[in-house]
UniProtKB/Swiss-Prot annotation:
UniProt organism field: Paracidovorax citrulli (strain AAC00-1)
InterPro entries referenced in this protein's UniProt entry, alphabetically: Ald_DH/histidinol_DH, Ald_DH_C, Ald_DH_N, Aldehyde_DH_dom, G-glutamylP_reductase_CS, Glu-5-SA_DH, GPR_dom
Record-stated family: Belongs to the gamma-glutamyl phosphate reductase family.
Subcellular location, principal: cytoplasm
GO cellular component, one term: cytoplasm
HAMAP family: ProA
Gene name per UniProt: proA
Swiss-Prot/TrEMBL GO biological process terms: L-proline biosynthetic process
Enzyme nomenclature, EC number: 1.2.1.41
Protein name: Gamma-glutamyl phosphate reductase
An example molecular function term from Gene Ontology annotations: NADP binding
Catalysed reaction, written as an equation: L-glutamate 5-semialdehyde + phosphate + NADP(+) = L-glutamyl 5-phosphate + NADPH + H(+)
Length: 426
């Protein structure tokens, strides 16, 4: 596909999406829910075929030498597909926020003023690896009354094409336009440049991938961007804490799955509990093959752990997103140092405190500058499905418009509604 053909194709997709967005914006809730349920059914009915398409992507990825954590992100296992189907069903049971009017109040002039929640219109989604994002984005787009143009990574092209076909079939079965969800079929990177530079069609871009991709899009886009940056998440073990609980949570936050952006990459431990806690969590990590990169005090406390892989941490380790069985560990004086460390080195994604002190917990919630802050829970809960959003289109580390897991409301905006009875301004 030459440059001119790519440009023409993207503009055609944009025009079709814009037309479809007008129909989606006024679609009744029951019709949108019918499409979501049809999609859930198709995902279950086509699990075997989808895995065959996915197998081709996995084979190419391994042949190309893609790192195993990245290959893991490509997998469409039965569990992943079932989670996607459940997400669609959960969205279908949720209330429809489109058209809701809030804050209606009488003004001294006589008019009544409120705000109505409406779809954004058309969003472009650019993402790498995870093909399940195709379903998450499509289902949220349907529920929120938007249209979307999806551009997945070349490494998942067969999986994404198969999933996009199912989405369009479900839309058409429900009587909605198939063009409301479109996939950019070419793997040529030039397509991204066109997608992010079509303000006449696209209202917002949502990139989800590596730091380089997101920085490039943020720099070059001619439409607003909702960024999903890296997940350098932290778990802070406070003094006082329930050490047994802290071991359980710190283990889950790191090892339940290594590749997601909400896995803890940094472990901070208050000096008062370090001697008791670190050998216990160190033994757990060692048994699971997790490399521990620590400060000198950490390494001294872990020196007696059988089978432990210990490495001196560098300054870079404190801000690193590993997406692998590696964790940085630092002993800190207490809460103040932990908060300062997280705000300096973290990515403002998700951070947790494990504590018995209510005041410490409240300070952590107020002062840690992250999209999600947690008390006595694993950072792995930072997820739209776990938050009851049905699905998420990403986890925004921005502070404006949407922050944290972006669900239905993150894909809407508010417009002012003014009601009068022939009122005129004096």
């Amino acid at each position: 596909m030459n440059a001119q053909h790519i440009a023409e194709t993207l503009h055609a997709l944009g025009s079709q999406a814009k037309a479809a967005s007008a129909l989606m914006a006024r679609a009744p809730s029951a019709v949108k829910n019918r499409a979501l349920l049809a999609l859930a059914r198709r995902l279950r009915d086509n699990t075997t075929a989808l895995q065959a398409d996915n197998a081709r992507d996995l084979e190419r990825a391994r042949a190309a030498g893609l790192a195993e954590p990245m290959v893991d992100r490509l997998k469409l296992t039965p569990k992943v597909l079932e989670t996607c189907a459940l997400g669609c069903e959960q969205l279908a049971t949720m209330g429809d926020v489109i058209g809701e009017i809030s804050g209606m109040r009488q003004q001294p002039s006589g008019i009544r003023v409120g705000q109505m929640r409406v779809p954004i219109g058309v969003f472009g989604m650019i993402y790498e690896s995870r093909p399940n994002v195709t379903i998450e984005a499509a289902s949220l787009s349907i529920k929120s009354g938007n249209a979307c143009i999806l551009r997945g990574g070349s490494e998942a092209i067969d999986s994404n094409r198969a999933l996009a076909r199912l989405v369009q079939e479900a839309l058409e079965e429900a009587g909605l336009p198939g063009d409301a969800v479109q996939l950019v079929q070419t793997t040529d990177r030039e397509a991204v440049g066109h997608l992010i530079a079509m303000p006449q069609y696209v209202d917002v871009i949502i990139p989800r991938g590596g730091k380089g991709l997101i920085e490039r899009i943020s720099r070059d886009a001619k439409v607003p961007v909702i960024k999903h940056l890296d997940g350098n998440c932290h778990t802070y073990v406070d003094d006082p804490c329930d050490v047994a609980m802290a071991v359980k949570v710190a283990d889950n936050a790191k090892t339940q799955k290594y590749s997601p952006c909400n896995a803890s990459e940094g472990l901070l431990v208050a000096r008062g509990v370090a001697a008791e806690f670190l050998p216990r969590i160190g033994a757990v990590y060692a048994a699971k093959g997790v490399e521990m990169r620590g400060c000198p005090e950490t390494l001294a406390l872990l020196a007696g752990v059988p089978g432990a892989t210990l490495v001196h941490a560098t300054e870079q380790d404190w801000s690193e997103e590993y997406l692998a069985p590696i964790i940085s560990i630092k002993v800190v004086e207490g809460l103040d140092e932990a908060i300062a460390h997280i705000n300096r080195y973290g990515s403002h994604h998700t951070d947790a405190i494990l504590t018995r002190d209510h005041m410490h917990a409240q300070r952590f919630l107020r002062e840690v500058d992250s999209a999600s802050v947690m008390v006595n829970a694993s950072t792995r809960f930072a997820d739209g499905f776990e938050y009851g959003l049905g699905a998420e289109i990403g986890i925004s580390t921005d502070k404006f418009h949407a922050r944290g897991p972006v669900g239905i409301e993150g894909l809407t905006s508010l417009k002012w509604v003014v009601l009068g009875e022939g009122d005129i301004r004096a």
